[in-house]
Structure formats: C-alpha cells, structure tokens
Amino acid sequence: MTTLKVATINVNGVRAAFRKGMADWVVAERPDIIALQEVRAETTDLLELFAGTEDALGHSWHVLHDAASAKGRAGVAVLSRMAPTAHRTELGPDEFDSAGRWLEVDFDVNGQTLTVISTYVHSGEVDTPKQVEKYKFLDAMTARMDALRADGAFVVVLGDLNVGHTELDIKNWKGNLKNAGFLP
C-alpha cells in the first residue's frame, strides 16, 4: 500500500505565497501532491517557482495548471512527485471551462486510478448574478462527482469551496449568517 501526503492551499497568488515562505514550507512538509487554488500566474511561473525546491527535495515536479482566460484571476494547479496518467479541465458548461476553477488529475497508485481534483469556487454575492453562477458551478461539480462515483473512481476533492456548513467552518459565523457561502 502506498501512502501519499497530499496538501491543498489557496495561495491567493503563487508569487506572493513564495515571497512569504512557501518554498520553505514545501521543503519542510514534503508533500507528494499539492493542489493550489487562486494561482493567478502562468504555468511557466509555477515551473520556475517550484524548481527552487527540487534540489532540496531530490525530485522534480510534474505541474498541471488550469489558468483562467482572464489574466490575474483564479487558476488552479496540481503538482506531484509522480507522473500523472491523464488530466481534464472540462467541467461544463463552457463558461466554466475557461475560468481556471477545475482540474482533475489521474494517477496510478497501486494499480488503481486515483483522481485528484483541485477546484476554486468563487464566493458569489447574495442576490446577484454571481450567486446564480456559483450555484450553477456547484450543480456542475455535483454532477461530475456523481459521474465519477458511478464509475467507481477513487477521488480526492481539494480546494477552496467557499462554503461553510456549520459554525466551526468559519471564524466569524454570526457576522456571516447572511453572506454568500454561509447561507442556510
């Protein structure tokens, strides 16, 4: 049986995260798979930044990235020590497929396929088109996860879902009762 150390981080800009010490964290924690959200950079930036950790770790990274078509927005990535066998960025409808919010990556682990998903669900604003868009995204996400489950897939969903179900999910829960992401 293979044990994997998996991490997920909303970096809110990967260059800023590296300025704040992310490279040291990666070297200290030594994850096998890292899912990133709100990358806000190009694939070349990810390759360059994570290359700085490779000597200390003794391995190179496999980098898959779904950048948003709007530069400086969203973007999700999966970095791994092991080579992926496949990846997909299509969630559907088409409006989501260019938003840099969904990335599925398959790995062969002990002869079985493990699908790792990195996703970023925007917060949405109450009673606005953004909230409608968020619910459409969540519906598409649910349909995709149902399809994966029907196939018997082993799946790990990682990301910033911007959803709080209980008081424990958010620090200031009373102040957020009427905010998107923490609605009844």
Task: Provide a role label for each language-model segment.
Residues 5, 62, 115, 154-156:
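Proline-centered loop/turn at the N-terminus of a beta-strand
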Residues 15, 43-45, 72-73, 124-127, ...:
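Short catalytic/ligand-binding loop motif for oxyanion handling, primarily in non-cytosolic enzymes
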Residues 53-56, 137-184:
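Metal-dependent phosphoesterases centered on the DNase I-like endonuclease/exonuclease/phosphatase
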Residues 23-27, 102-111, 140-153:
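Short amphipathic alpha-helices and their capping/turn segments at secondary-structure boundaries
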Residues 14-18, 97, 133-140, 182-184:
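Soluble or luminal CAZymes and related metallo-dependent hydrolases
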Residues 92-95, 121-138, 172-179:
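Surface-exposed cleft-lining segments at the edges of enzyme active sites
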Residues 1-55, 63-76:
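N-terminal, active-site-proximal structural segment of metallo-dependent hydrolase catalytic domains
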Residues 40-124:
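Structured beta-strand-rich core segments of catalytic domains in phosphoester-bond hydrolases
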